[in-house]
Regions:
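Electrostatic, structured charged patches in enzyme active sites and in nucleic-acid/phosphate-binding
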Residues: 1-408
Length: 408
């Protein structure tokens, strides 16, 4: 993923714009990607330091004018993202250093003019004890240092695909500095919406979803700390949401960003058609929700869990996207479930207002005790309920509540 400093932009008043990628620029990006990809493939088995040096030499050899150096660095970064490095045992490396340094200290103390300290001999002895070579011992001394990690594989995107997705990669980097994003999306396949909404929840973003007149949705996105004006702490999540948004048939984004060294507030807009950056699966459930699902499925009950999120729309009031639904085997009764556990009180009250406006679905909301919202606020609504939990979601308590809702 690109960082904000690698994006080539222009300012027009209070608007931030990307430099357009025309045919000439796209061909240039593809050529750079091909050059850097070739270097990466040739260095499989080399250290990260050796690869980085070779990539830097390759960049210098392109002899680009100053205005193009940022583009070169951006392509280099995207190619580097396709590299997989070994993850050495840090404890083993530290233990090896202690042993070799202890031996070296003892050897230097015992050395004399007639019998000087012999580093090579020390490494050979240590290697013999470990049934390896002196070269392997020396390489292992600092194997836990990033520069010494070895490139295991290169699985970067084809140069043409990297060039085709370059503008989207730049837009993703701009969103690292976003404080708020409004997206308009439209897709023919309901599964695209489900994957998008699940991705937003997985990223701990707070989507405000409304049905649009064209059959799509308008989505407002804030991070959980958006109440602190100007915070870009959740810019990474906003950036990571872009591929799921761009998978829709048509989409557009309007963002408020803080840009430059002075963090000047600017507006940023980008739009397009369906773009597949890479093959991806639907994101996994958050850990706390996955743990609950596992616990619930161990219960002896008549209910099964459907993990394909539904889109519950109350025209004129808003949209709710539960995390999952419980379905009773004997009669097909369905109760939706949404975890609002550690989000904001504002999000919880939005759901309460949606229910009070007449949401025509049975639904249970699980809310963290820390949000200070009482279960009684929905006592007079027979088709919806709040379940307040302290640390973990108790499967038996949820079962009791969905049984009551199903009976309503």
């Amino acid at each position: 993923m690109l960082t904000a400093d690698l994006v080539t932009t222009r300012r027009r008043g209070d608007e931030l714009r990307l430099v357009p990628v025309d045919a000439r620029r796209r061909a240039h990006i593809e050529a750079l990607a091909a050059r850097f990809s070739g270097i990466a493939r040739a260095h499989v088995g080399s250290t990260r330091e050796q690869l980085d040096d070779a990539l830097d030499e390759g960049a210098a050899a392109t002899d680009q004018p100053n205005a193009e150096r940022r583009l070169v660095a951006a392509v280099q970064k995207l190619v580097h993202d396709g590299c997989s490095f070994e993850e050495p045992d840090a404890d083993a490396a530290a233990a090896l250093r202690r042993d070799i340094f202890r031996r070296a200290a003892a050897g230097r103390r015992a050395a004399s003019p007639s019998a000087p300290f012999d580093r090579a001999a020390l490494l050979e002895v240590a290697a013999g004890e470990r049934a390896t070579t002196a070269a392997e011992i020396e390489a292992g001394l600092y194997a836990d240092r990033p520069a010494r990690q070895r490139l295991q594989a290169f699985a970067g995107r084809p140069p043409a695909a990297l060039a085709a997705g370059f503008e989207l990669a730049e837009a993703q980097a701009v969103l690292l500095r976003a404080t708020r994003v409004t997206a308009s999306v439209r897709a023919r396949d309901a599964g695209t919406y489900r994957q998008l909404f699940r991705t937003l929840k997985f990223l701990r973003l707070l989507p405000t979803i409304a049905a649009a007149e064209d059959g799509g949705y308008t989505i407002g996105l804030d991070g959980p700390l958006s109440l602190f004006q100007g915070s870009t702490r959740y810019g990474l999540q906003l950036g990571l949401a872009l591929p799921a948004i761009a998978a829709c048939d048509t989409w557009s984004i309007a963002a408020e960003v803080r840009w430059g060294a002075d963090r000047r507030p600017l507006r940023f807009r980008v739009a397009g058609g369906a773009v597949a950056l890479s093959a991806s699966e639907a994101p996994a459930l958050p850990d706390e929700l996955a743990a609950f699902v596992a616990a619930f499925e161990r219960l002896d009950s008549d209910w099964r869990i459907d993990q394909a999120p539904a889109v519950l729309d109350l025209p004129g009031a808003g949209v709710c996207v539960p995390d999952l639904a419980f379905i009773r085997a004997r009669d097909g009764a369905r109760v939706h479930f949404e975890l609002l556990g550690f989000w904001s009180r504002e999000t919880v009250w939005r759901r309460i207002e949606l229910v009070r406006a007449g949401l025509p679905h049975r639904i249970l909301f699980a809310v963290s005790k820390g949000l200070r919202v009482g279960e009684a606020v929905l006592d007079e609504t027979p088709t919806a309920a709040l379940y307040v939990f302290a640390r973990v979601i108790a499967a038996k308590q949820v079962l009791d509540r969905i049984e009551r809702l199903a009976a309503a």
